[in-house]
Amino acid sequence: MKIENLCVKYDKNIVIENFSLNLTLGEKVIIYGPNGTGKTTLLKTILGIVKAASGKIIFEDNEIIAYCKQDYPNPEFPITVEEVVAMGIKKQNKNSKEDIKNALIKANALNLQGRLFYSLSGGERQKVSLARCYCQNANLFLLDEPSSFLDTKSKNIFLEQMKNLENQNCSVIAVTHDEELIKNLNWKVIKWNK
């Protein structure tokens, strides 16, 4: 994926100005900067949720994007772990149960089968969210503040999964203000300047 001179505005306010990035297949990148400076907007622009004022985002053929957002709405909604992971499957097929199981194994989350998603800890939810991404067979992962709201134990669990991504044949952009991610991951770091 290539981003060329991306500019994004909300009304007349410039949120992103002349941002460029050339992401190669398999490359892992952390975009580091304070909250409220447009990092999430960048991900939403890549996804096409937010329209760019100018600039280009160029994707490789057959780019499949998986997005892990930082918030979990409707905490009382009774959705199971398997149902969350199944959201990554575009079409129900005869192998969908096997695909879900394989994705949970890949995310080291098979022990969470059968549980309600909102009964899980923050770190466990992030593992399940990664399993959903794996189920999409995505080659580009967008992670929005993936370690936010995690206690120390949950963060350590999730860091293991982030390290596992290093061995996957996918590209990753993680946006964060968490210095611990930078210290614990040997990824390219881009300092976000608004």
Residues of each region from the PLM?
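Conserved ABC ATPase "signature" region
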Residues: K97-L112
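H-loop/switch region of ABC-family ATPase nucleotide-binding domains
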Residues: T176-H177
